[in-house]
Amino acid sequence: MIRRFHIVAIPIRIVVNRFGDHNPNGMIYVLKENESLIKKKVELNPYTPVDLVEPLVIRANVGDEIEILFENKLPFNTSMHIQNAEYDVLTSDGAFVGFNKDTTVKPGESIMYKWKVETEGLHFFSDLGNTLSSELGSNVHGLFGALFVEPRGSWWTDPVTGKPINSGAFADIHNPLLPSFREYGWFFNDEMEVDDLTGQKPINPHTLQPEATHSVNYRAEPMRNRLRLIQEGVVCPDCESEEVHHDSWVFGDPDTPILRAYKGDPIKIR
């Protein structure tokens, strides 16, 4: 089966928690069909996490061929370089290496990548157009995602609505010959550029030094925000012990993803 996706690399503000910590220079892959909606939701919620802003996960079955129309809306060359899939290195590598043709994409242009998948599981992709490891690079700002390859004959649905989906980090996977299971994409992102609500670098209340933010699926719940509210008596003024900052009874669920399932559900975390 041939599966076709139109994917766009876009700049976007990424809000990582309800405290307003955010990356003003975020970059993500999105399906073209969701681009306008995502931009509108982010514009309307500048200091609140938006559910649709997450690492892009697309799916296919073992044996499928995938055609990606990739469009670049960032101000430098970008690409989609996939791991573990089969492809022609001269046309679909998403890189500019040696004497091979440049298969990264200039700003405002597009390219067709063609992949074939024969192995079930995780096929990570990321940008190799801008490989800088600093904040001038793209990967640290969120330009990564994955193709999840399912058993032959599978289909996937939204875990809340039960409707078919074209993308999403979380999904329910069904197969006529195998038990259904819940699937969760879990992406670690080390030291994304994150500012606080005021646009300043976050400060650790213990060390009084700038603090990095480690995120999961573009979300983070750093101790610094909760601890400061407790120290200032804004939250739980009668509570004792700093360990209260870990407690969801006080603060509610964290903004990092919650993996929801019923007792006995088969699950896979990729």
Where are these regions (language model features)?
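Interdomain boundary/hinge segments at the C-termini of tandem beta-sandwich modules
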Residues: 9, 147-151, 188
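N-terminal, post-signal-peptide metal-ligating segments of extracellular/periplasmic oxidoreductases
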Residues: 1-104, 184, 196-268
